UniProtKB/Swiss-Prot annotation:
Protein name: Transcriptional regulator MraZ
Listed Gene3D superfamilies: Transcriptional regulator MraZ domain
Location of this chain's protein in the cell: Cytoplasm, Nucleoid
Name of the encoding gene: mraZ
Gene Ontology cellular-component terms listed: cytoplasm; nucleoid
Organism: Ralstonia pickettii (strain 12J)
Lineage: Bacteria, Pseudomonadati, Pseudomonadota, Betaproteobacteria, Burkholderiales
Length: 142
């Protein structure tokens, strides 16, 4: 299970260094193989390959009215491997789709990660906090 936020920097080639606390889990769970694709909220999702296979099967089973989302998720997916330095290459197309230039946030979301442009993430987080909690969380005990 992946959790926590990490402020990271993309290098000139578009590579992102996976924090050491997650590298071992990715090596054990997926032999360093991951898949990156678009997320509907404007960020990217980074899956260990076995989790991606489960997600891909769920997407492929969606009804015909979701065909554009199948294209978005599956058509933009990129299979990559952690290099010897623990970095993942984000393709130029995916970097452009998520407006990733230099400063990024990597968020552990349980079974996968989200990769956000740092400024976009901060703005969206502040907007969510300003709106208050949704009804689904009103009775949640902290």
């Amino acid at each position: 299970m992946f959790q926590g936020a990490s402020a990271l920097t993309l290098d000139a080639k578009g590579r992102m260094s996976i924090p050491s606390r997650h590298r071992e889990a990715l090596q054990l769970q997926a032999e360093g193989r991951v898949t990156v694709t678009k997320h509907p909220d404007g960020c990217l999702m980074l899956f260990p390959r076995p989790e991606w296979e489960r997600f891909r099967e769920r997407i492929a089973a969606l009804p015909m009215e979701a065909h554009w989302w199948k294209r978005i998720f599956l058509g933009s997916a990129a299979d990559v491997e952690l290099d010897t330095a623990g970095r993942v290459l984000i393709t130029p197309e995916l970097r452009a789709a998520a407006s990733l230039e230099r400063d990024v946030m990597l968020l552990g979301m349980g079974s996968h990660f989200e990769v956000w442009d740092a400024a976009t993430y901060t703005a969206k987080e502040q907007a969510a906090m300003a709106q208050g909690m949704p009804d689904a969380l009103k009775n949640f005990s902290f």
